[in-house]
Amino acid sequence: MFLLLPFDSLIVSLLGISLTVLFTLLLVFIIVPAVFGVSFGIRKLYMKTLLKIFAWATLRMERGAKEKNHQLYKPYTNGIIAKDPTSLEEEIKEIRRSGSSKALDNTPEFELSDIFYFCRKGMETIMDDEVTKRFSAEELESWNLLSRTNYNFQYISLRLTVLWGLGVLIRYCLLLSLRIALAFTGISLLVVGTTMVGYLPNGRFKEFLSKHVHLMCYRICVRALTAIITYHDRKNRPRNGGICVANHTSPIDVIILASDGYYAMVGQVHGGLMGVIQRAMVKACPHVWFERSEVKDRHLVARRLTEHVQDKSKLPILIFPEGTCINNTSVMMFKKGSFEIGATVYPVAIKYDPQFGDAFWNSSKYGMVTYLLRMMTSWAIVCSVWYLPPMTRQAEEDAVQFANRVKSAIARQGGLVDLLWDGGLKREKVKDTFKEEQQKLYSKMIVGNHEDRSRS
């Protein structure tokens, strides 16, 4: 029989007491408040403390740069090129005028100087285009003590180095272990809870339990990211029979929204852990999952969504029409499919604060596990959510126009740039139609002016 020495027994006892105290604190201050949807204000106090530390760190670096007669690196938030919103015709007129050529109205034919316009536009696009920079992390104006966000290493003092090292220990040893425990708790409760609810007969009681199980588990998962969320205009929250559309930055957008509302999810059937979660969730709630072979069938997808929204007793569908993650500086083209089925649309704008951690998932650079590790080793996830008034398709609108109107409303409320480009350009080459569009504009300018002159 194996006997413990007195010293070994003491260590085991202390370890057991420590784990008991840790679990008790976890239960009392995090899990129980998450279950009931209340907060003790600890996270907001934590956020205010971090802001003061970031401000102090920035002042220290500015002082170090000043002593060396240098300036700190500052990102160009509006781009590195000053661009005036002028048309192709106006710019070519200006080029011909400055080159002492004849005016465009007098000479509709091709001029050799016209190529300077296209050369300049090409060089501007290579240096600073408005599309590809939306697929990389947003640059910060100040350092947040995460090494991956600092461009001013040479101005770090000894005090800042010690503070950064202390931050690494806190994030990777204390916060990471705590967050993993919370995430495991939330996911386990979601799978077990929804599976058990799924065995109940359909009715109000099952719907009541399903709603509160989902909310409880998502709120625990929100705590696992130390997410500090501010919800605005809750009176506009999506209702049954509608579609909730939002800008898309990260997979955690789902958790952010689902911790404050009850939604039917739409997505492709997965395997592994995600597949286990999906199968458990659909037992308790009418989510809309598609097989891989069905996703490409637009008519089948539209029919399934239409059938869902026509039943006013079913939950609002949560959809991200961009179809890919954007870095939360802009909103890109909304796919029209969600706007063709004639349901009431409830727009939602989500804006993250990158000071505490970059929520953007660059899926072409990081896998899901790496991304979640980055999230759980950040300081926090801070964001604001705005519920906009419901919108319906007008009689004279087609689906594309309706989608653009909803997109503009989301961009305006969230302080994001409204772009017409397709987010699919993250992985695909630019279509020839985009290239041909510039050729058509130039041809129309030349040929059109020539035809007008011939008629007169």
From Swiss-Prot:
Which pathway is it part of?
Phospholipid metabolism; CDP-diacylglycerol biosynthesis; CDP-diacylglycerol from sn-glycerol 3-phosphate: step 1/3
Secretion signal span: 1-37
List membrane-spanning regions.
156-176, 180-200
Q: Which family does it belong to?
A: Belongs to the 1-acyl-sn-glycerol-3-phosphate acyltransferase family.
Q: How does it sit in the membrane?
A: Multi-pass membrane protein
Instruction: Present the record's domain note.
Output: The HXXXXD motif is essential for acyltransferase activity and may constitute the binding site for the phosphate moiety of the glycerol-3-phosphate.
Mitochondrion as UniProt keyword: no
Disulphides: none
Q: Which UniProt keywords apply?
A: Acyltransferase, Endoplasmic reticulum, Glycoprotein, Lipid biosynthesis, Lipid metabolism, Membrane, Phospholipid biosynthesis, Phospholipid metabolism, Signal, Transferase, Transmembrane, Transmembrane helix
Q: Which Pfam families match?
A: Acyltransferase
Tell me the name of the encoding gene.
Answer: GPAT4
Q: What organism is listed for this UniProt entry?
A: Bos taurus (Bovine)
Q: What is this protein called?
A: Glycerol-3-phosphate acyltransferase 4
Q: What is one cellular component GO term in this UniProt entry?
A: endoplasmic reticulum membrane
**GO biological process per UniProt:** CDP-diacylglycerol biosynthetic process
One GO MF term on file is: glycerol-3-phosphate O-acyltransferase activity
Question: So what does this one do?
Answer: Converts glycerol-3-phosphate to 1-acyl-sn-glycerol-3-phosphate (lysophosphatidic acid or LPA) by incorporating an acyl moiety at the sn-1 position of the glycerol backbone. Active against both saturated and unsaturated long-chain fatty acyl-CoAs. Protects cells against lipotoxicity.
Residue numbers covered by motif HXXXXD motif: 248-253
The EC number(s) this enzyme carries: 2.3.1.15
Carbohydrate attachment residues: 247, 327-328, 362
Q: Which reaction does it catalyse?
A: sn-glycerol 3-phosphate + an acyl-CoA = a 1-acyl-sn-glycero-3-phosphate + CoA; dodecanoyl-CoA + sn-glycerol 3-phosphate = 1-dodecanoyl-sn-glycerol 3-phosphate + CoA; sn-glycerol 3-phosphate + hexadecanoyl-CoA = 1-hexadecanoyl-sn-glycero-3-phosphate + CoA; sn-glycerol 3-phosphate + octadecanoyl-CoA = 1-octadecanoyl-sn-glycero-3-phosphate + CoA
| Annotated compartments | Endoplasmic reticulum membrane
Q: Does the keyword Lipid metabolism apply?
A: yes
Q: Report the top EC class in one word.
A: transferase
